[in-house]
């Protein structure tokens, strides 16, 4: 009987301790300071408002994942948010942002809406060009003051909404994958500023306008990183051979050769 009483006493003490800690966390760890760090096109007030966090909220009862998702959804240019608790009463949002690297132009050809299993036609094609991030996140419509360095043709954006991912008809999915792959590799290899357009209107290849003088034909599938390295090397070699900037087409879609250069015809 004494043993049972001892166990019961310990359990009661443990429950009291948990209750005390919970009460203490509720009373003493309330948000008094909200800070935002990182370069941002959004103001501190905009980021805090999107988070939904308010002074007086409990530091340990907030759902950090849900808060991050709210910020990412409401503020399209935000790439990631780290939420840091600083005892006793500070919460800090560390924000990184996407750059608008490309703009998806209006494309009228191809499938412009999809139908559900019961025949509902649902997703309308975009009627204006949209800015996207490297990963294909829709940022905002193109305007006179907001543009991107790379123009993309050959994709039909469906039901675009800022903060969502670029969606296209099923028959363009492989081209969308090719686009995000090439944008990622262009960024990693420091080539974004050298490319002015990506043409995805062709069936089996994409065409990049490079350095304002080279139309580079790349396969839609395969090792995009390798193709870009090979392209860069081939263009450098052609420029050296000609003693200046080469003008023409560089074809990397032929199995027999790494790259084939065809000079542009001179007008005359």
Segments and roles (model prediction):
Residues 40-73:
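Short extracytoplasmic
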Residues 73-75, 83:
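Structural recognition of beta-strand segments within beta-rich domains
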Residues 18-39:
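Aromatic-capped interface at the extracytoplasmic side
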């Amino acid at each position: 009987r004494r043993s049972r009483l001892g166990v019961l006493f310990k359990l009661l003490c443990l429950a009291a301790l948990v209750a005390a800690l919970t009460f203490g966390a509720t009373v003493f760890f309330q948000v008094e300071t909200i800070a935002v760090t990182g370069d941002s096109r959004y103001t501190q007030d905009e980021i805090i408002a999107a988070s939904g966090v308010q002074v007086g909220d409990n530091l340990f009862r907030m759902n950090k994942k849900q808060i991050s998702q709210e910020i990412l959804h409401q503020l399209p240019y935000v790439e990631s948010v780290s939420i840091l608790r600083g005892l006793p009463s500070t919460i800090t949002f560390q924000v990184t942002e996407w750059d608008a690297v490309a703009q998806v132009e209006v494309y009228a050809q191809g499938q412009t809406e999809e139908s559900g299993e019961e025949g509902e036609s649902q997703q309308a094609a975009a009627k204006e060009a949209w800015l996207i991030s490297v990963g294909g996140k829709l940022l905002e419509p193109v305007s006179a003051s907001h543009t991107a360095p790379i123009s993309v043709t050959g994709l039909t954006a469906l039901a675009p909404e800022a903060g969502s991912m670029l969606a296209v008809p099923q028959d363009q999915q492989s081209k969308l994958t090719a686009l995000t792959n090439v944008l990622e590799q262009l960024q990693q290899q420091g080539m974004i500023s050298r490319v002015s357009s990506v043409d995805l209107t062709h069936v089996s290849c994409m065409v990049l306008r490079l350095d304002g003088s080279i139309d580079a034909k790349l396969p839609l599938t395969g090792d995009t990183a390798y193709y870009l390295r090979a392209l860069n090397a081939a263009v450098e070699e052609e420029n050296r051979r000609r003693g200046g900037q080469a003008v023409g087409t560089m074809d990397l879609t032929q199995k027999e050769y790494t790259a084939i250069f065809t000079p542009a015809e001179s007008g005359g």
